[in-house]
Design a protein with these regions (language model features):
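A generic structural signal for short beta-strands and their flanking turns/coil linkers
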Residues: 32-34, 47, 66, 88, ...
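Short, surface-exposed beta-strand/strand-loop-strand elements in extracellular ectodomains
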Residues: 44-66
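Glycine-rich nucleotide phosphate-binding loop and flanking beta-alpha elements
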Residues: 44, 84, 98
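Short edge beta-strand/loop segments characteristic of extracellular beta-sandwich folds
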Residues: 35-39
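C-terminal interaction-tip segments
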Residues: 1-31, 41, 94-115
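Intrinsically disordered, low-complexity Pro/Gly/Ser/Thr-rich segments with frequent PxxP/GP/PP motifs
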Residues: 58-89, 95
Length: 115
């Protein structure tokens, strides 16, 4: 079995759809997400982010975190391992800002792939 370290990055949007897919494990790949860093670059609005994964190869999502608060100009770190099986998806999206301004959130994940 080969092990490969991967990095994934995402400009986080507000839609709970495929545009929020940060990482998808390949068809014959198992993956361990070591950590997720979610940064709110907005100097005014608190960000609320949602983190979900599939457990069945990409169709049924379950929340790891719902409306997790990231303070202004700050970073939230999820540092416990998340195991993904082949075709599983890691998705991140934000709740819209109350003043209707654009969210300014970035996310980064450190991932170990095993194939």
């Amino acid at each position: 079995m080969a092990s490969t370290f991967k990095n994934a990055g995402l400009d986080v949007g507000v839609l709970d759809d495929s545009t929020g897919n940060m990482y998808t494990a390949g068809g014959s790949v198992y993956a361990v997400v070591h950590a997720i860093y979610i940064s709110n670059e907005n100097a005014t609005n608190l960000a609320k982010v949602n983190v979900k994964v599939t457990t069945d190869g990409g169709s049924t999502f379950y929340h790891i975190g719902r409306s997790l608060e990231v303070d202004v100009n700050n970073t939230l770190v999820l540092d416990k391992p998340i195991n993904l099986e082949p075709n599983d998806i890691l998705r991140i999206y934000a709740d819209p800002n109350p003043d209707s301004s654009s969210v300014d959130v970035e996310a980064y994940a450190s991932i170990l792939e095993i194939s």
